[in-house]
Amino acid sequence: MLGNAMVEACPAEGDAPVPITPAGRPRSGQRSYPDRLDVGLLRTAGVCVLASVMAHVDVTVVSVAQRTFVADFGSTQAVVAWTMTGYMLALATVIPTAGWAADRFGTRRLFMGSVLAFTLGSLLCAVAPNILLLIIFRVVQGFGGGMLTPVSFAILAREAGPKRLGRVMAVVGIPMLLGPVGGPILGGWLIGAYGWRWIFLVNLPVGLSALVLAAIVFPRDRPAASENFDYMGLLLLSPGLATFLFGVSSSPARGTMADRHVLIPAITGLALIAAFVAHSWYRTEHPLIDMRLFQNRAVAQANMTMTVLSLGLFGSFLLLPSYLQQVLHQSPMQSGVHIIPQGLGAMLAMPIAGAMMDRRGPAKIVLVGIMLIAAGLGTFAFGVARQADYLPILPTGLAIMGMGMGCSMMPLSGAAVQTLAPHQIARGSTLISVNQQVGGSIGTALMSVLLTYQFNHSEIIATAKKVALTPESGAGRGAAVDPSSLPRQTNFAAQLLHDLSHAYAVVFVIATALVVSTLIPAAFLPKQQASHRRAPLLSA
């Protein structure tokens, strides 16, 4: 397991005192960690950030390019949406294998292989001659990108140790949160200046740089002894997650979750996932994802909190730029600029949150973060309901929401592994990555369905959509709707604005309620810092 790799890995610093037992004897085989964030650790964090930001920015950049794909390939929005869905399904398929692969091949080699796969996928996407090949190459990207987050986190957890984990996650989290904010700006500029292919070509120098730096900076870790791979677990979980998320992601196009094209794959996926849970719980050796980690109270509460929080948070992420573009008539680049307060709020809060987590444990700071997210999202919903201009309500809500993200997301990830033994960290980080992905995917689909439901119950919006789909409007080819093509009736534009704002406000309020409900599992997170107490360690 990863224990061999972690225990035998080259230390970043060798001058720290050797840990001793209560009887005063050094603990043989254990690694010592300095209290400060040394240069070696910061270099390792920098390489992890470089690769992770590349993958995170790519997601937001591709979302900005959806209309451009429709126009250039002469396709439909339903087909083009698979450039996002295919990537998501690839993530769901590969993330469960990250823990085993880290143990089997070593985190250093797995990280470099993941960066290489993502970079090659980017090159293939850039030269794709049609929409079908673009979707296929996005899946290749997803196979590489799916490994990056859990493997990067395992590397950082190994190099930082429990006493420095909160601070190093704060250092890493700032650029990772700012990256997606800059994605729409970068994407809008590249598409306008050079064309959509450059949103993929820009990944090549970044990916190659991360590959070279990883080879230089990362310490060599020894893969664990060969173990029996859990093929049955893989055959149950990966298709289960992919099938379930396929069904859920199909719901916005169907307008309801009650459609058979949604229910059949979703129920099939849930059945496969349930079978995997039973298989993993009773498999005595090397399960793909060790569900027995949930016997650790800190792991269970952190994963439950992350899943519920992702439901409300990631669904609202999808709708923020959509609202700014559709209702406030902003361009993709403008909407990206106007979401910057969210990133600035996270940047302000994250260093404080990391230091507090190291001193006091994750519970209090996560609770504060969730309350801030709810307050910020509620403020934004209030501005939307009032049909307010961007200033001053909307940026205020975004900034408060960003501060909450800075106080909650990284501490939750840290809480999921902070009480685990070294050989369990890769499996623990894989577990919370899977739950975050599943929660975010369900939340995104849920918010899209709710918004579609609100749109379908407005005659004004239905009329506007019919106009937008006519060839004369240009919207079917990815262009904006010509206001002169709207029906010439009294106050039609004002009524359309009212109905659009009401639809978005309802969805944002529901997202806020989901975030508030996260306070329940978060209240049971560990109240103490990890070095002061250790949860019972499970055999792996």
From Swiss-Prot:
GO cellular component: extracellular region; plasma membrane
Keywords, comma-separated and alphabetical: Cell membrane, Membrane, Transmembrane, Transmembrane helix, Transport
InterPro entries the record matches: EmrB-like, MFS, MFS_dom, MFS_trans_sf
Gene Ontology MF terms: transmembrane transporter activity
Primary location group: membrane
Membrane spanning stretches: 45-65, 78-98, 117-137, 171-191, 198-218, 229-249, 262-282, 304-324, 337-357, 365-385, 390-410, 431-451, 505-525
Pfam families linked to this entry: MFS_1
Membrane topology, record value: Multi-pass membrane protein
Cellular localisation: Cell membrane
GO biological process terms on file: transmembrane transport
Cross-referenced Gene3D superfamilies: MFS general substrate transporter like domains, Multidrug resistance protein D
Family listed: Belongs to the major facilitator superfamily. EmrB family.
PANTHER family for the chain: BLR6921 PROTEIN, MAJOR FACILITATOR SUPERFAMILY MULTIDRUG TRANSPORTER MFSC
UniProt-recorded name of the protein: Multidrug resistance protein B homolog
Organism: Mycobacterium tuberculosis (strain ATCC 25618 / H37Rv)
Phylogenetic lineage: Bacteria, Bacillati, Actinomycetota, Actinomycetes, Mycobacteriales
